[in-house]
Amino acid sequence: MAEETNQSLEDQNVQVEEGQTISDEAIEQAVEGAEKELDNAKKEIESLKDSWLRERAEFQNYKRRTANDLLNARKESIKKFAEGLTGALDNLERVSNVPNQTPEVVAFVEGIKMVQKEFYSVLEKEGIKRLDPKGQPFDPMLMEAIASEESAEFTEETVVETYQAGYYHEEGESKQSIRPARVKVGKPQS
């Protein structure tokens, strides 16, 4: 601070010779000038600090958005991939359910069932599950009602028959339909 005062005095062209005294007014002016410079420097530091904090917060938000975007892109890729597999899985299901199999075909069908099981295992690791809701309450988010029947035996809308299995992606409590199960719904009589 003494250096700033001397600098301020030099700026005011005050020359002090040895043995001379500086007036109180000159000292006050030098101190006021130094205090103004200090206040300006503090304000600039505060401004730069605020700017840095805003930039840091913006960068943190950018990182969070990017991570969410990557996660959503991954989920969407898995979903698209699973959508493409549903037809092939349906065909494997049809082959494995062929009635009146000859002994030669039985071994082949068993191999198909093993491949089918492996597909389901891989899909489940990614949170994709097969839905065959026969006997379960009807869920319009995961099922599509193709037909319905009314009966006194039903107290709520219940799946009576599954025409085509559905697939959904499960993450925590959330279930997102990939392909709805096509079902026949039993309804209570009105």
Swiss-Prot record:
**What is one process in the GO biological process aspect for this record?**
protein folding
**Annotated spans, Disordered:** 1-22, 170-190
Here the segments flagged for biased composition (Basic residues) are 181-190
Q: Under the cellular component aspect of Gene Ontology, which terms does the record hold?
A: cytoplasm
Main subcellular location of this protein, as a coarse class: cytoplasm
> What InterPro entries does the record tag this protein with?
GrpE, GrpE_coiled_coil, GrpE_head
| SUPFAM superfamilies attached to this UniProt entry | Coiled-coil domain of nucleotide exchange factor GrpE (SSF58014), Head domain of nucleotide exchange factor GrpE (SSF51064)
Q: Which domain of life is it from?
A: Bacteria
Q: Which GO terms describe its molecular function?
A: adenyl-nucleotide exchange factor activity; protein homodimerization activity; protein-folding chaperone binding; unfolded protein binding
Q: Where in the cell is it found?
A: Cytoplasm
Keywords, comma-separated and alphabetical: Chaperone, Cytoplasm, Stress response
- Read off the NCBIfam families from this record: PRK14146.1
Assembly and interaction partners: Homodimer.
Assigned protein family: Belongs to the GrpE family.
Task performed by this protein? Participates actively in the response to hyperosmotic and heat shock by preventing the aggregation of stress-denatured proteins, in association with DnaK and GrpE. It is the nucleotide exchange factor for DnaK and may function as a thermosensor. Unfolded proteins bind initially to DnaJ; upon interaction with the DnaJ-bound protein, DnaK hydrolyzes its bound ATP, resulting in the formation of a stable complex. GrpE releases ADP from DnaK; ATP binding to DnaK triggers the release of the substrate protein, thus completing the reaction cycle.
What this protein is called in its record is Protein GrpE
Can you name the source organism? Leptospira biflexa serovar Patoc (strain Patoc 1 / ATCC 23582 / Paris)
Gene behind this protein: grpE
